[in-house]
Amino acid sequence: MFELIYPGWLAGILLSFATGPLGSFIIWRRISSFGDTLSHSSILGLAISILFQIDSFYTELFFMSFLAIILVWMEQLLSVSLETILSIISHSSLSLGIICISLMSTSHHIDLSNYLFGDLLLVTVFDLCIIALGSLIVLTILFFRWNSILLLTVNEELAQIDGVNIFYARLTLMLTTAICISIAIKFVGVLLITSLLIIPPATAQIFSNSPEKTIGFSILISIISVTGGIFLSFFYNVPTSPSIVLFSSCVYLLSNIKKLI
């Protein structure tokens, strides 16, 4: 049994080391819809990959990275709030992607179910290497840019006074998030990746009193959620990714039990 679920479990653990820190910054900056924007726009990236017969991973990575740059640029120049920009781009790119895929479905066989929900149990050794490399890149970037991104998150004006390049710090955070999502979508799915970015850090905040502890607890809770969700999926023969999200949500609710009573 363990041999069947081990690759998927290991993939989830490796992803946790990237989603934990990134999700924490996303919550601190109150841009939780950013993950939805990138994941929804990946549908358009999928349409492009089908049109040009390119591996969807590369088109999604390029497209989401490009979109992250555009979002940072628009946030810098426009007076509209970031949440408004994210909402407009999210639904526009999702709509365009769905229209493109529907037009191409007459000449291509397109199965969106795996893409929307993912399948963590179909991980190969090559996939594990990609996930490990991607998580390592994310952690390395965050390690070297920790002070500037944290200062930007705490107080943007203070960060500017301290000499932090605001545009570059924002771009770093959004690009690393784009890398993480483009890697995770294949295994977790478009509809659920944001949940894995948001729920564990939200739970971790209950037990933490510092940024470092929040990230540490977030990674730990992600690992617990992945482990519990995979076993739940295996024993009850239900989809893996929704099981992980549901398990993570239960952990969040149990952590808030004192407030709920």
Curated annotation (Swiss-Prot):
Superkingdom to which the source organism belongs: Bacteria
Record bears the keyword Ion transport: yes
> Which CDD domains does this UniProt record tie to the protein?
TM_ABC_iron-siderophores_like (cd06550)
Q: Can you supply a Gene Ontology BP term from the record?
A: zinc ion transport
Role noted for this protein? Involved in the high-affinity zinc uptake transport system.
Keywords, in A-Z order:
Cell membrane, Ion transport, Membrane, Transmembrane, Transmembrane helix, Transport, Zinc, Zinc transport
Task: Report the leader peptide range.
Answer: none
Q: In what way does this protein cross or attach to the membrane?
A: Multi-pass membrane protein
Subcellular localization, as worded in the UniProt entry: Cell membrane
Which Pfam families does this UniProt record tie to the protein? ABC-3
What is the protein name stated in its UniProt record?
High-affinity zinc uptake system membrane protein ZnuB
Note the PANTHER family from the entry. ABC-TRANSPORTER METAL-BINDING PROTEIN, HIGH-AFFINITY ZINC UPTAKE SYSTEM MEMBRANE PROTEIN ZNUB
What InterPro entries does this protein's entry cite? ABC_BtuC-like (IPR037294), ABC_TroCD (IPR001626)
